[in-house]
Regions:
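Classical nucleotidyltransferase
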Residues: 81-186
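N-terminal catalytic cores of NTP/NDP-binding nucleotidyl/phosphoryl-transfer enzymes
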Residues: 1-56
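Residue-level signal for inorganic ion chemistry
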Residues: 12, 64, 98, 159, ...
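Phosphate/ribose-recognition catalytic cores of enzymes acting on nucleotide-derived substrates
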Residues: 176-254
């Protein structure tokens, strides 16, 4: 196998550029491309704080499965391994080459120099290769942190450009206060994943898929203090949808 390692939140264009290199190098070497990722975000394990995420674990795994052979690790189980110990584990699992992202580091010894990883690789029997960064002239600097900043600033267009797809949240439709219906605007409130990052409060133009059809949707993110609901809500008014969608799984896309 030829492998790469990371959390890959959002599976954005920079990640997919890395995976493209992984597949090309694998084809040239006759090796199966493999992606090693973690079940938990490292900050959740190391700092006890779960950061807002661009993709839930299931969303992330689903996106990664199409990019290479997927291996999901528990970060809590490997957090104390040094880079050498971790590479020994990879070698035992059949990894012959390791492609490292241009800004990626791993191991409890917190090595920062690529030459150290290359040296350990030689000692372990793994060829360590540096990946190229996605050229900035294509879409500018791309990172999960930059996408989070764009979303938090309400710049969904920039976030989508860096992601390479439209940002979305999904969840089951739950009973709201039905106030929208009383003023002629029936809405669907979804019970979205708590770890999912939302843009700032406001009304956004988007789309929603219902029963194999896409509908233009006004998505309202915010609180509803007029009815005593202080939690953040995700509520969509789907233009042209008739009937009750309560209990259905919906996906709001921006």
């Amino acid at each position: 196998m030829i492998a790469t390692i990371g959390y890959f939140d959002g599976v954005h264009r920079g990640h997919r550029y890395l995976f493209e290199q992984l597949r090309q190098l694998g084809a040239a070497r006759g090796l199966v491309p493999a992606i090693y990722t973690f079940r938990e975000h490292p900050k959740e394990v190391l700092c006890g704080v779960r950061p807002p995420l661009l993709t839930t674990p299931n969303e992330r795994f689903r996106l990664l499965e199409g990019e290479g052979e997927l291996h999901v690790l528990s970060f809590a189980e490997i957090r104390r391994l040094t880079a050498a110990e971790f590479m020994q584990r990879l070698h035992a699992e059949g990894v012959q080459s390791l492609l490292m992202g241009y800004d990626h580091h791993f191991g409890a010894d917190q090595l920062t120099d690529f030459r150290d990883y290359a040296r350990i690789g030689r000692e372990t029997g793994i060829e360590v290769l540096p990946a190229n960064e996605l050229p900035e002239e294509i879409v500018g600097h791309v990172s999960s942190s930059a996408i989070r900043r764009a979303l938090l600033a309400g710049d969904v267009e920039s976030a989508n450009r860096m992601l390479g797809y439209t940002y979305s949240i999904r969840g089951r439709v739950v009973r709201g206060n039905a106030i929208g219906r009383t003023i002629g605007f029936p809405t669907a409130n979804i019970d979205y994943a708590a770890e999912k990052l939302l843009p700032p409060a406001g009304v956004y133009a988007g789309r929603c898929r219902v029963a194999e059809h896409d509908y233009p949707t006004l998505v309202n993110i915010g609180t509803n203090p007029t009815v005593g609901n202080r939690s953040t809500t995700a509520e969509g008014y789907m233009l042209g949808v008739a009937g009750d969608v309560y209990g259905q799984q919906l996906c709001f896309r921006w």
